[in-house]
């Protein structure tokens, strides 16, 4: 605000009392209520201080608006000039007012390494910025290409292959992750590829309407090989653990005639036909003179199971098969030959009798049948516990449909 001195012309003069009142009101308007300091007021004194002229021009309104803006917090980085207490107008006080500086826009930062991204090409996942080299699969540590999908789960970045290994269900037979477009067969809670739903022994494909069974290990067996699996499973459950030891011959009689001979050690009781003893002499001959030196073999569960399973496939194995079976069961080749010979004799005797003899190995439970369900049907329908159904899992399941929080580049 600028003030001008009055001229000598009496026509331009005004009343002194009125001018002082207007000047006081102006100073009160220009006083800052918070700091109580006069801001940007310039007064030029004259040799004749008795009379003043006040200019109500547009400059006053502009400067008044400027003072109002200066009181706002965003306009504080200005230098205010106020007159000193003395009458000398040349002595001015400069005061710097602190304000926040206007900074340029922050550069994009990588959310992993927190460094600025200055590359021409960046990766954006879920609205966050990353370096192309920083965005990697956390299992195989391979950076993502532009055509690859990036799966994000629990804050972990995974490629398609590692995500399938970690979260997708796999085929029970080939252990390959199941894709959404794959046709699958479901037996109880186990899922198979359509091509993997075959018999474990002969490899024949199981079709709708065929009879099959499933072992506790998840192996499928057709109706032709059901008997081998039936005897193997029940032998494992019903057989009693036997001591796989060779009974030593009785000790020689004492030399003295006065003392009574010691009692012979008790022989372990012979089991039923499930124990499958190999009654052979030590030298391979069945002569009665050496019957006292005959060694009797008792088989373990896994040995008996392996021999019965192989007997269901081949009743008369050759030398090569016996060698492999001996390495698997830890038995001698001679013991295996005798066991297969006795098993063949028993099998022919049962066929000659006109039917299988009643034994605790028979299974009274019916075989399970399987049905083919429509592609989108659920497997939770009520059916017998013995029935294994073949169907395709619903495509709307979370196993085969992509999750909502998965994001790709």
From Swiss-Prot:
GO terms for molecular function: DNA-binding transcription activator activity, RNA polymerase II-specific; DNA-binding transcription factor activity, RNA polymerase II-specific; metal ion binding; RNA polymerase II cis-regulatory region sequence-specific DNA binding; RNA polymerase II transcription regulatory region sequence-specific DNA binding. Gene3D superfamilies: Cysteine Rich Protein, Homeodomain-like. It holds the Pfam family Homeodomain. The keyword Transcription regulation applies. One of its GO terms (cellular component) is nucleus. Transcription factor. Binds to a sequence motif, 5'-TTATTGGCTTCGTTAA-3', which may be involved in AIY interneuron function, in the regulatory elements of target genes; binding is more efficient, in vitro, together with homeobox protein ceh-10. Required for specification of the AIA and AIY interneurons and the NSM neurons. Positively regulates the expression of a number of genes including ceh-10, ceh-23, kal-1, hen-1, ser-2, unc-17 and sra-11 in AIY neurons, and cat-4, flp-4, bas-1, ptps-1 and mgl-1 in NSM neurons. This is LIM/homeobox protein ttx-3.
């Amino acid at each position: 605000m600028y003030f001008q001195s009055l001229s000598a012309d009496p026509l331009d003069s005004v009343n002194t009392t009125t001018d002082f009142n207007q000047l006081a009101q102006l100073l009160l308007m220009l006083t800052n209520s918070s700091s109580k300091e006069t801001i940007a007021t310039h007064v030029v004194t004259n040799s004749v201080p008795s009379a003043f002229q006040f200019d109500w021009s547009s400059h006053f309104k502009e400067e008044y608006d400027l003072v109002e803006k200066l009181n706002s917090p965003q306009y504080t980085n200005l230098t205010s000039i106020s007159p000193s207490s003395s009458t000398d107008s040349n002595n001015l006080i400069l005061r710097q007012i602190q304000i926040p500086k206007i900074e340029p826009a922050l550069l994009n930062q990588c959310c992993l390494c927190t460094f600025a991204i200055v590359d021409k090409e960046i990766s954006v996942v879920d609205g966050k910025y990353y370096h192309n080299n920083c965005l990697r699969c956390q299992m195989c540590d391979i950076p993502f290409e532009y055509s690859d999908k990036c799966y994000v789960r629990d804050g972990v970045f995974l490629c398609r292959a590692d995500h399938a290994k970690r979260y997708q269900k796999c085929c029970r037979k080939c252990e390959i992750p199941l894709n959404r477009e794959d046709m699958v067969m479901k037996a109880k809670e186990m899922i198979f590829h359509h091509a993997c739903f075959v018999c474990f022994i002969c490899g024949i494909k199981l079709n709708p309407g065929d009879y099959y069974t499933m072992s506790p290990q998840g192996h499928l067996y057709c109706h032709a090989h059901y008997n081998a699996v039936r005897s193997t499973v029940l032998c494992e459950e019903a057989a009693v653990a036997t001591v796989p030891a060779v009974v030593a011959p009785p000790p020689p009689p004492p030399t003295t005639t006065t003392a009574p001979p010691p009692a012979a050690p008790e022989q372990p009781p012979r089991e039923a036909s499930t124990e499958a003893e190999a009654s052979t002499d030590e030298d391979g001959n069945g002569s009665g003179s050496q019957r006292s030196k005959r060694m009797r073999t008792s088989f373990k569960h896994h040995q008996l199971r392996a021999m019965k399973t192989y007997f269901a496939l081949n009743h008369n194995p050759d030398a090569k098969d016996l060698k492999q079976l001996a390495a698997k069961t830890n038995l001698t080749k001679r013991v295996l030959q005798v066991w297969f010979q006795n098993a063949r004799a028993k099998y022919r005797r049962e066929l000659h009798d006109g039917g299988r003899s009643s034994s605790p190995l028979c299974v009274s439970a019916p075989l399970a049948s399987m049905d083919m369900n429509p592609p989108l049907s659920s497997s939770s329908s009520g059916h017998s516990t013995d029935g294994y159904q073949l169907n395709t899992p619903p495509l709307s399941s979370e196993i085969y449909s992509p999750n909502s929080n998965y994001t790709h580049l």
